[in-house]
């Protein structure tokens, strides 16, 4: 849930949005705001532990506010591999930022399995090495912290490109193979769901292809049944 409003009304709007969503579904929330103080203000209104989006090294206070907030809870957190200089163009800087954020988290008893690292994929229209850098960063991060999670804003890869959906689908498969185990994406998109399930089949993550077959029989993937 993200309010996306002006700072003056963000807390009020985000709380309203959280209430609306929690009245409709019994699912954990991913609370999203660029302002850690906003997250701090609405945190208590979540009915169950979810995910905080996000911390980074952009400013000194993000980790210092969010980590103590989720200390001793089951909350998880998304950590962006950027700092005050912006999004790194190289892999090593993303690795270095990851280490800093994981080490800070450890001081509050937050283990790597509660952290979702976002290596920040850049639009391929501006950097045609974007996927390769994302994959390399993902593999190295998983080598250092095997239990850590990897996520991404999936559609960022195709920004500025025509036929975006095929680029997004291809990115999903390659990123999953590299170690990405979650993504910010539309769960109602049939093509993306089919790609995700097919990739799980090919990676040996769907025993006897049961999830894929079940989704097809239910009409969730494949041609729409009349």
Residues of each region from the PLM?
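Glycine-rich, proline-tolerant flexible connector loops at the mouths of alpha/beta enzymes
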Residues: 1-27, 121-131
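Glycine- and other small-residue-rich loops at beta-strand/loop junctions that grip anionic moieties
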Residues: 2-10, 28-32, 54-55, 90, ...
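Short, charged helix-to-loop "capping" segments that act as catalytic/coupling loops
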Residues: 8, 59-61, 146
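Catalytic core of soluble alpha/beta enzymes
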Residues: 12-116
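Catalytic alpha/beta core domains of metabolic enzymes, predominantly
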Residues: 65, 72-221
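Long amphipathic alpha-helical segments
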Residues: 223-226
């Amino acid at each position: 849930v993200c309010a996306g409003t002006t700072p003056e009304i963000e807390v009020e709007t985000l709380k309203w949005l959280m209430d609306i969503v929690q009245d409709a579904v019994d699912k954990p929330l991913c609370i999203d705001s660029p302002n850690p103080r906003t997250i701090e203000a609405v945190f208590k209104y979540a009915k169950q532990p979810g995910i905080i989006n996000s911390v980074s090294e952009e400013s000194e206070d993000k980790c210092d506010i969010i980590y103590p907030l989720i200390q001793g809870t089951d909350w998880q957190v998304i950590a962006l591999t950027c700092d005050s200089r912006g999004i790194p163009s190289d892999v090593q800087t993303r690795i270095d930022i990851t280490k800093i954020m994981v080490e800070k988290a450890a001081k509050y008893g937050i283990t790597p399995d509660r952290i979702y690292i976002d290596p920040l994929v850049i639009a391929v229209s501006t950097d045609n090495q974007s996927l390769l850098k994302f994959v390399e960063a993902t593999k190295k991060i998983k080598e250092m912290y095997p239990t850590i999670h990897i996520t991404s804003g999936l559609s960022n890869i195709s920004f500025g490109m025509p036929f975006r959906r095929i680029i997004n689908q291809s990115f999903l498969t390659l990123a999953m193979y590299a170690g990405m185990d979650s993504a910010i994406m539309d769960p109602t998109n049939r093509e993306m769901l089919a790609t995700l399930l097919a990739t799980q089949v090919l990676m040996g993550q769907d025993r006897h292809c049961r999830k894929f077959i079940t989704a097809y029989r239910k009409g969730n993937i494949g041609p729409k049944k009349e």
